[in-house]
Amino acid sequence: MGSKLYMVQGTSAYQTAVGFWLDIGRRYILAIVLSAFGLTCTVTIALTVSVIVEQSVLEECRNYNGGDRDWWSTTQEQPTTAPSATPAGNYGGLQTARTRKSESCLHVQISYGDMYSRSDTVLGGFDCMGLLVLCKSGPICQRDNQVDPTALCHCRVDLSSVDCCKVNKISTNSSTTSEPQKTNPAWPSQDNTDSDPNPQGITTSTATLLSTSLGLMLTSKTGTHKSGPPQALPGSNTNGKTTTDREPGPTNQPNSTTNGQHNKHTQRMTPPPSHDNTRTILQHTTPWEKTFSTYKPTHSPTNESDQSLPTTQNSINCEHFDPQGKEKICYRVGSYNSNITKQCRIDVPLCSTYSTVCMKTYYTEPFNCWRRIWRCLCDDGVGLVEWCCTS
């Protein structure tokens, strides 16, 4: 009998397994890979757009806060109080307004009480003008401002506090109170200080404080008559002498003022210097207005500058507040610009109904205010609130 051959066709177990996994891969693995790739691309695109937007905002904020376009700035929003409570004048070249929100940028630090007095740059630079403006626009000096716009407002600064007080028109002579209406409130530039016989006269009538308290007294007339004789403060006699005079003679000046702040300072008379022509203009008994109109800069700048500031160690000289030596805020301030539109803001829930004053300054402390930034102060009705803004 013959044999027959049979052919059996099929697949082995190995081929079956390979085919199974290839089928799984075609169905699921490809879908997973594509999903992961799409998700990664989406996240990357979203992050890129966010970074671009953030960099744009930061650049605008940096340009606004780091530029040298304006030295001073205030917030400009709709007033929340009556129009009569809004400051009507431009004090020292600064325009203030009561605001609903406070201007700031990015990193904000609130501080009560501490003026960071360890840095003479901050204390001398800002307090020279900004705090006086804050006093004038605050509730203390604005209470009777509409009735008596010529009243003087004083600002006293010490190590950790600022005191504002208002002197009524009755306590000052008529020529002193009427003088600010004839003068330009803008501060002269430091280019004009060469012809000024008293380059440091900005603090002449205000720099006699106790040697244990670091501070100065500013009035609404500081900076308007630098070339004239010292201005008569409340409590001075009729011959034109102020509480900072250094002439010898009987100390029969009144020792009390309207607010009783300077009764101790008028008794601390410094011995006269050896110059023969020291403040001869103050020895006349002519009225103040006549004396000022006939005053001629006959004294040398050296003699005048020696007499303008006391020799105490703790006195603040506002001229030298800038470590770079480029700006002297007591002599020159930047122009106010109300057309700034690009502003980075963070709402500071303080001082919602009181004025705010901001300026660019140099910080040495605290640690997050070490660079040139905006420094702002406002009055919350109890005391001064300070915050800083870094870009």
Curated annotation (Swiss-Prot):
Predominant place of localization: host cell
Any one GO CC term of the record: virion membrane
Keyword annotations: Glycoprotein, Host-virus interaction, Membrane, Transmembrane, Transmembrane helix, Viral attachment to host cell, Virion, Virus entry into host cell
PTM: May carry a lot of separate O-linked carbohydrate chains distributed among serine and threonine residues.
Virion surface membrane side: 50-391
Cellular localization per UniProt: Host cell surface; Virion membrane
Bias (Polar residues) ranges: 171-202, 250-261, 279-316
GO biological process, one term: virion attachment to host cell
Segments in the Intravirion topological domain: 1-28
Region (Disordered), start-end ranges: 171-205, 219-316
Entry's transmembrane regions: 29-49
Role played: It is likely to be the virus attachment protein.
Protein name as catalogued: Major surface glycoprotein G
Gene responsible for this protein: G
